[in-house]
Amino acid sequence: MNCLILWSWKLAVPTITKANINRGVVKLKTINPILNTFITGDCEQVLKEIPSDSIDFVLTSPPYADKRDYGNENSSISPDEYVEWFLPKGREIYRVLKPTGSFILNISDKVVDGFQHLYVFELLLRLCKEVGFHLVRDYIWYNPATPPNVYSRGGYGRTKKSHEYCFWFSKGSDWTFELDPIRKPYSKDMQKYLDGKGK
């Protein structure tokens, strides 16, 4: 399985490394030169060098839309600009995925002017309608670093989020899900219910 994990979106490293693929201009004609290789660089540029239909799985957690300074060039993105910023990367992810490939997007939303901004949901719609992804499932990742809390700002109270989203997209309709690694045995009550001996 060829997996691609895009974690750092814009690093201070200007080109793909592995000794700059033997110090030449990087042009990857096959996936073999990057197997088992740690690659750093601007993810959009790195993706452009990866052959089409060559990756089975992509996992990414792009920067938050909070105008946070990550210490890198062009690293702060506002919620209003987020969808347009991400879509070119989404198109490249779609291109490099095999027809049976999957893509997990870990993303968080943002409250702006007292209301939850809708950029996450707009991004989901556009990734499916414009890029061609299929949304297989959404998952909630509980983040213990941000415990639930209540806070008030400007007279409005609300609970603080303690989760982020993980959206599972597929490129085509023939995707794979391995259930066995996460299965748990049924409880006694559930087994009785399934056997028709309980309510």
What spans do the regions from the language model cover?
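Core catalytic lobe of class I
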Residues: C3-K199
